[in-house]
């Protein structure tokens, strides 16, 4: 019976994530349609609400193709690893579901998120295609480059809040959000999350005019869907992660409603901002993408970290201990 309840808890935790991924695709197409003065999907179901399910059925009934000279085990294992890491990261988020509230949850999120580059690189190499390999190398270089700025910003927030625990960091913002006191870091964090999740205008891994579809160009059917679900689950995760770190704090409506209305509203605004950026800005060149993080964001992140260390030393705030 214990195993049955554990399985039910896991299902109740995963189904909302998968449904949110499905409807995020619909919202994205609707937003892009309205910003381009056209209607989005509006045929399948009322207001097009059944369009994600129709797309899912169409993709899953497609044949799973495998290149002749590919590495079969790594070729099919990479999408599974990518999706598993994306869903595993949700276990450390402070949501109203059975999650892991660990003392070093922030470090675990940072470490596990960096492991996704192995799945991307494995898929590009196992496909035995030059376009897949070039897309994978681009994605890995981009992810690693922007993770440095993200890690420095996280270190600044850890020092500022004196804790590695996500729940504690969220609760320390009860009277003032970190986005107000650390506004430049908040801006750098938002742009870096776009690059980290390979979203426009930093979607260089999917440059259609250069490398076709990037590291997943040889995937079709089920394995492609696993990559797709993992990418959009990471987008939702990074948006919620941003809300917890910079716009956290208990809502005054928590006693009236079962969920925090303020956090849900801000998270929805964040998601709309990500979609709006895709519709408004063209794709960067790859050299501009690299120069942005190494010549702009990295020096600013290091300077902000030094400033916060000096402020902590002046105010006598205790540094976090393991």
Swiss-Prot record:
One Gene Ontology term of the molecular function aspect: NADH dehydrogenase (ubiquinone) activity
GO BP terms: aerobic respiration
Catalysis: reaction(s): a ubiquinone + NADH + 5 H(+)(in) = a ubiquinol + NAD(+) + 4 H(+)(out)
Protein origin, superkingdom: Eukaryota
Membrane-spanning ranges: 4-24, 73-93, 106-126, 150-170, 175-195, 224-244, 257-277, 302-322
Predominant place of localization: mitochondrion
Location in or out of the cell: Mitochondrion inner membrane
One annotated Gene Ontology cellular component of this protein: mitochondrial inner membrane
Keywords: Electron transport, Membrane, Mitochondrion, Mitochondrion inner membrane, NAD, Respiratory chain, Translocase, Transmembrane, Transmembrane helix, Transport, Ubiquinone
UniProt EC number: 7.1.1.2
Family the entry assigns: Belongs to the complex I subunit 1 family.
Name assigned to this protein: NADH-ubiquinone oxidoreductase chain 1
Gene name per UniProt: ND1
């Amino acid at each position: 019976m214990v195993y049955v309840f554990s399985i039910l808890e896991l299902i109740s935790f995963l189904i909302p994530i998968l449904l949110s991924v499905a409807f995020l695709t619909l919202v994205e197409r609707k937003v892009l349609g309205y910003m381009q003065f056209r209607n989005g999907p509006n045929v399948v179901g009322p207001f097009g609400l059944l369009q994600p399910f129709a797309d899912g059925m169409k993709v899953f009934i497609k044949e799973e193709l495998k290149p002749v000279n590919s590495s079969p085990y790594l070729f099919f294992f990479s999408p599974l690893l990518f999706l598993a890491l994306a869903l595993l990261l949700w276990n450390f988020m402070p949501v109203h579901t059975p999650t892991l509230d660990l003392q070093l949850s922030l470090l675990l999120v940072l470490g596990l998120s960096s492991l996704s580059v192995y799945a991307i690189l494995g898929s590009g190499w196992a496909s035995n295609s030059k376009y897949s390999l070039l897309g994978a190398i681009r994605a890995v270089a981009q992810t690693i480059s922007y993770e440095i700025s993200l890690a420095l910003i996280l270190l600044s927030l850890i020092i500022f809040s004196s804790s590695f625990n996500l729940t504690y960091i969220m609760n320390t913002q009860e009277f003032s959000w970190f986005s107000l006191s650390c506004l430049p870091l908040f801006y750098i964090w938002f742009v870096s999350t776009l690059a980290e999740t390979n979203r426009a205008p930093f979607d260089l891994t999917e440059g259609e005019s250069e490398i076709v579809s990037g590291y997943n160009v040889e995937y079709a059917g089920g394995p492609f869907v696993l990559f797709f679900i993992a990418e959009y689950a990471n987008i939702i995760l990074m948006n919620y992660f941003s809300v917890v770190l910079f716009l956290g704090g208990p809502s005054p409506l928590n006693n009236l409603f079962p969920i925090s209305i303020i956090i849900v509203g801000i998270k929805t605004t964040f998601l709309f901002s990500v979609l709006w950026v895709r519709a408004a800005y063209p794709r960067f060149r790859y050299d501009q993408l690299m120069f942005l993080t190494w010549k702009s964001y990295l020096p600013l992140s290091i300077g902000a970290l030094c400033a916060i260390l000096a402020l902590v030393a002046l105010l006598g705030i205790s540094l976090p201990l393991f």
